[in-house]
Amino acid sequence: MGDMYDEQFDKAGGPADLMDDSWVESTAWKDLLKKLHSVKFALQSGRDEITGLLTTLSRQCPYSPYEQFPERKVYFLLDSRANNALGVIQNASAFKRRADEKNAVAGVTNIPANPNTTVTTNQGSTTTTKANTSSTLEEDLYTYYKFDDASTTFHKSLTSLENMQLKSYYRRNFEKNFGVKFGSASTPASGGSGATPPPASGGAVRPNP
């Protein structure tokens, strides 16, 4: 038989139960947080970048019953808090803004208190035209505030991830923590237990008392 982990691997709460969880190599995790921190969320290109970063992040389990935990590498085990925060960031990055993106960087344009317009006709009379307060303006304001919510959610979730203490494992503490050993499966000795080996001198074999 080939090399594999011993029976401790399959015990409740052991490594076998964690194989479907999210594991991220420590360097890749730190690189992800650094890139997310530098993203310009106000720009659509920045939000698209977030989607790409999360899509390419490998979260596969680095071991199996027949594959020993990697040597000289540290992995973080992502718990429910980390996975939820990543999901929130993914949802926030999916926001599509209809208004000009420059407004999101500069802030909301001030709206006059009385935005009515007065026009003088050829006959000398004046007419007053009320500003557009219909659905277009309402949609722009709604879109802005929804964007503001998405931006706030993104930055709060990122800060949470940066301050989160995750469980980290490398080969030695992984195998020590779970009490597992990796190696060749033992095979029973030929001849069965209790068999008496032949004498070196070639003399007669005496029966066991």
Swiss-Prot record:
Protein name: Coat protein
Keywords, in A-Z order: Capsid protein, Virion
Subcellular location: Virion
GO MF annotation list: structural molecule activity
Stretches the record annotates as Disordered: 108-132, 181-209
Main location: virion
Low complexity composition bias: residue spans: 116-132
GO CC field: viral capsid
Plastid listed as a keyword: no
Record's keyword annotation contains rRNA processing: no
